[in-house]
Amino acid sequence: MGYTSPLEDTKFVLENLLPAHEDLDDTTIDAVLSEAGKLADNYLAPLNHFGDKNNPILRQDHEVETPEGFSHAFSEIAKGGWIGVASDSDYDGMGLPVRMSAAINEYWHGANMSFALCSLLTQGLIDAFTLVGTEEEKKTYLPKFNSGAWTGTMNLTEPQSGTDLATIKTKAEHDGENWRIKGQKIYITYGEHDMLSLIHISEPTRLAII
């Protein structure tokens, strides 16, 4: 099914309506959006309907095989550094303003939301580590996220709880050295990955809600 990225509309907003940004000129905006639009129109949009008709496969070795073409499209996005568009260049990101990442995400989600969620969730982890991570954690994780070598997941749903986080039961308790997790998560978005980042809310008793 066809999709055409709204390049001219986006450029107009970025160049005329939003406040100027010292690291962003019209030439950069045009070049970045043009390439992002090509990826959306030529790679992601054609996969959208195909992915709806061809479900991912869970193999006997418990590895997940995504629909044909998804892996290649993700490889193209990762090689281009697109996941880390707004991430600090000190950690192999592009270092562009968040507004550029927002525009690109609009294209990709408009073209193929089921595919684009993977990079969006990874960008969420990039934001989290950038805001609260130690320098050691940033050096360890951010280059991997920015390159697409590691990707993010979303772990909200439990047997008794959907997106109502006040009703979740999974907790983590600190034993003095490590966090011990107890609970169950289901319907994990892009969950078939080895590396998971846990976001918790600490309580006075050192319990945490995952």
For the regions a language model picked out, list residue spans one by one:
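Short, well-ordered loop/turn and helix-capping segments at boundaries between secondary-structure elements
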Residues: P19-A20, G110, D127-E135, S147, ...
